[in-house]
Amino acid sequence: PHILHDLGYGNRVVHIPAGPDIHLKKEDLYKFIPDYVQGILEFSKNKGIRYDLIHSHYWMSGIAAIELQKSWNIPFVHMFHTLGVMKQRVARENEEIEGEYRISGEKEVLNHANRIIAATQAEVAQLLWLYQADTNNVVVIPPGVDLCHFYPIPSDEAKEFIKVPVCNRMLLYVGRIEPLKGLENLLKAIAIMREQVQVEAPQFCLIVIGGNPDLTPQTTDTEMAHLQSLREQYHLQDFVAFLGQRDQNTLPYYYSAASAVVVPSHYESFGMVALEAMACGTPVVASQVGGLAFLVQDGITGFTVPVDDPQALADRLMKLLYDDDLREKLGKQAAAFAKQYGWKNIAKKIIDLYRTVLSKDGNE
């Protein structure tokens, strides 16, 4: 195992070999969970380490946690982040449909975990409605944001740092390039906006961060190809730029350079991009789905719009882009709102949960 020791006092990452040393599809990783569990057991035995509690993330790690719980006889808490049944319900393409093995695995995790952490009350409702979960075993603790990394940067400084040609009013999308993320609707909204903007008005543009925009005959990213085709179809070459992936350390500059950040997803269990943007003092326009409906406060930190409604999305984006006073007001309110999600606050809630689970009452 490869061990990293640079995460601060009491923290380290241990890389456990499991499966072949080749790139695997997500659905193939499941087969190697037994190898992963065995590697963890051998590592702890060889190092003489006794763990008190397991905190697993995402469903496959939850399956591993069940096996480790059996071997070590210790409690575990789990956070799903996304749910298979929800992804099935909103899937736009066949490849986005989750296998039944995932859903049965999630149910198994629900039956074994000492506590389930949900990001929002929306996720609690989904666990009850779709999985018949015991909500007495579920606690809401949202993900946190690093306020030392994501904070407001003066717009001119941010635009100078990112060194990409940006327009006077810049919209920003950050995330994976897949149908579930709703980028097709965003391009439709941009096309509507282009028709509404007067020639003499300050122009706007959309910057898309994520994926690989360099298409070749061997490209397997069909969604990126589809979106670039739509950009041409709608004559948006001067309005939309696909930048590809960017280093995490540069994201605060992109967020701060933007007039608004757009999250047009069909499903988000939480919406980390929205939280990072708000921490940088940038208002967010997001779909009214899942965690986004709780995270983005309509008319206060940004706007929420019905999913699959490009016209409503265009209307809200236009309002933010061309009402400077409103944009500044919502941006300041967004930064203030995001402070409650700082890791200092969230970490305390997680530590309190650990103490509860480790106590006698928590293990009953």
Feature names for model-found ranges:
Residues 122, 144:
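Carbohydrate-associated surface elements
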Residues 151-164:
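A short helix/loop element that forms part of the nucleotide-sugar donor recognition site in Leloir-type
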Residues 283-286, 296:
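Short hydrophobic beta-strand element within catalytic cores of glycosyltransferases
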